Amino acid sequence: MPEIKLTHVTKRWGKFYAVDDLSLDMEDNSFITLLGPSGCGKTTTLRMIAGLETPTSGQIKIGDRVVFDSEAGINVPANKRKVGFLFQNYALWPNMTVYQNISFGLGNIKEELPVIDEEAKALKSMIKALENPGELVKLIEECRDKKGKLDLDMVYLKLIDNYTISIYTAKELYNYKLHEAADKESTSKQKKQELTAKLDSILAGHKEKREELNEKFEVVSGGKVVTRVRKYSKEEIDLAVRRVSRIVKIGMFMNRYPAELSGGQQQRVAIARTLAPEP
């Protein structure tokens, strides 16, 4: 989270001052605890930062951006502030799986975003995985149960976590059936050559348009990253969900419902959902 700065922030309901002339600096990447008795304004302050409550007066700045200024008439809505807010009761949707709870908000975001060549990004990830066929096969074989049957959910999770890829790329990588090949080295080499040729063709296509891809696989034209107003793709949403699930260690619970989780596990899901927008 970038630096957050509150300057002379006041929140008043009638004659009651929930927050009175508060000035506060929160440094970039710092961990801040607001300590005080019930009713002193802790939650109100957090809600004002997130945009869920409108201050009576003052200024709130997140990073280099002023998100509220009473004198200038600025009040950026909550969904444009990129601030995660973890409610005290977790507020998980009981009818949604863990995956759906985390991804739900991401699917509603629509803003100016870089144009990304997702196919090229996935191809590069698979090529990298195929550079070490022994490691790839080992990861898959580790997912057999006592009867020798592969647990596909575990296979996908291992591939996702080890290669930092989406579920879609993990499934495609598994479907190459490298673990079943008689000559794994030759099969891996052949598949790698096919994918490399496909990637080269994509890069050549960008070159014809006088474009290139940067290290994030964002399309660059004229030295600038190309952007457009759009929603996150399924690939981007899945990568975001997998990223935060690794942080809080809930990757194995993606298909479960909140009622099937312990209180601590539900808390992790709520934290993951808060982190997913990547403020």
Model-derived regions: residue spans:
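The feature captures the beta-strand-to-loop junction immediately N-terminal to the Walker
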Residues: L35-P37
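Helix-to-loop junction immediately C-terminal to a conserved catalytic motif
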Residues: A50
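ABC ATPase NBD coupling module
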Residues: V67-G84, N108, V115-D117, I127, ...
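Short coil-to-helix segment of the ABC ATPase nucleotide-binding domain corresponding to the Q-loop/switch region
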Residues: M96-G105, I109-D117, K121, E218
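Conserved signature/switch motifs of ABC ATPase nucleotide-binding domains
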Residues: R256, P277
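Conserved ABC ATPase signature
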Residues: Y257-L261, Q265
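Hydrophobic anchor residue at the start of the ABC signature
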Residues: I271
